[in-house]
Amino acid sequence: VQMRNVDPFLEFFGIPQGYSRGGEYVPREFKAGGSGVIISQDGYIVTNHHVVDNATELKVKLYDGRTFQAKVVGTDPTTEVALIKIEGENLPTLAFGDSDALRLGEWVLAIGSPFDLQSTITAGIVSAKSRNLGAIPNQYRVESFIQTDAAVNPGNSGGALVNTRGELVGINTLIKSQTGTYMGYSFAIPSAIV
């Protein structure tokens, strides 16, 4: 998932983001990336709220190279889940698994596009369940993260966490890091919440 957006930092501080030759204000746009999971053959995709929040344009690129315009169907900032839609038929989907049945030490795979490296898969184990980190900036947040040591980096947000049967057990959402990149602590929203 790629989005185009106005720079919220500059907007917050009232810093001009760009002007046309005639002096008319033109917001500066930037591109960002994330991942998503197709959950229906007609194009519904689950991703993270922060991947699509404030986006002015969404494009979805599939692993086979096809590109689609997408629209936001809905977001839930309390769970950090978003649903978007592309127009397509017979799209490949991922079946839901039972995140409640995951056991500590069980192998899982994180799938996504970290640093715009499409269709990247990393492996790790379930390190903990039901983590409440206070990471979702909403007083009504619902947090119960799956912790894993599968590598998750910027661009993985919204991507799939699957069990060894290839079933969706979580949506990769965040990392705990002092550098902003993977340091061994990755967190996913359980499929039971999605």
Language-model features: locations:
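Serine-dependent protease modules
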Residues: 1-194
